[in-house]
Regions:
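ATP/NTP phosphate-donor binding region
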Residues: 1-64
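Conserved anion/nucleotide-ligand pocket segment
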Residues: 118-200
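Short, acidic/small-residue loops that bind anionic groups at enzyme active sites
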Residues: 86-125
Length: 264
């Protein structure tokens, strides 16, 4: 039975979302444990920096943990990312980290070390989404894959519909189909390492050892950049994208792939 550890490395979360996600994951057949400080609430954060570091490092160090599910994003990982102690064992035995939003900082750290991770639903979505939600179905099948956390090969009609485990270190093909009501979209096929995550977090990591430029330097070929964000003003999105452009990032990637919910 695969073991999932739920931790809260960023903002505080209502305990009900952890508890309801835990029930659903156990119904899927997972053994689920919760980090010592996951239910905490100290101002904006789930716990102090030191306590959140302890939960992260304990989860990485525990050889029984197969998957680390971050309960929510928000803010907080950038304060502690340089204090995380990565596992001292073969990379094929590292736990798979799952999350999005602020968890992008942790994905960036793992990308720098050549470790695949999963940008996917966290506790609240795992609690509320219906069983037939396509992102939930994809996440469930991904997590239950016998070869997880090796890279996967999958095809997509805007969202993952079907996929199969790929050999370790294999490149992951990803097909994005044209949406006619978006005139700037183009059909195409691209192969490469998928990097990125939340644009605001990536922007905040610029100029640090965990920046996109540092990640791209570790890639043997131009990677695919994925970016997403929510509730940001148009001008702020524009500022962040031009920051990446002026940093030379758009000259080093194969294709930008993004999802945005922008406010006026």
């Amino acid at each position: 039975m695969r073991h999932i550890r739920i931790i809260s490395p960023s903002s505080a979360i209502d305990a009900q979302w952890i508890n309801r996600a835990k029930v659903r994951l156990e119904q899927w057949g997972f053994d689920v444990s919760v980090g010592e400080h996951a239910y905490g609430n100290i101002g904006r954060f789930s716990a102090t920096d030191e306590e959140r570091i302890i939960d992260l490092n304990n989860a990485f160090a525990d050889p029984m943990v197969d998957i680390i599910l971050c309960s929510r994003g928000g803010y907080g990982l950038q304060r502690i990312i340089d204090k995380i102690v990565l596992p001292q064992r073969p990379k094929s035995q590292w736990p798979l980290v799952v999350g999005f939003s602020d968890i992008t900082a942790l994905h960036s750290l793992l990308s720098l070390n050549g470790i695949p991770s999963l940008h996917a639903n966290m506790c609240k979505d795992l609690s509320l989404l219906p069983d037939d939600d396509i992102t939930l179905i994809a996440e469930k099948e991904f997590l239950m894959s016998a070869d997880c956390p090796t890279p996967l090969s999958f095809t997509s009609h805007l969202l993952p519909l079907s996929y199969h485990p790929a050999p370790h270190n294999a490149r992951t093909p990803y097909t994005i189909h044209h949406m006619s009501h978006f005139p700037l979209n183009r059909n195409g096929e691209v192969l490469g390492k998928l990097i990125g995550g939340n644009l605001s977090v990536l922007y905040g990591l610029q100029g640090t050892p965990f920046s996109l430029n540092k990640i791209i330097e570790q890639c043997s070929e131009p990677p695919i950049l994925f970016i997403e964000d929510i509730s940001e003003n148009h001008y702020h999105i524009d500022r962040m994208l031009h920051n990446l452009r002026l940093s030379g990032i758009f000259d080093k990637i194969r294709i930008p792939f993004s999802s945005m919910y922008i406010t006026d």
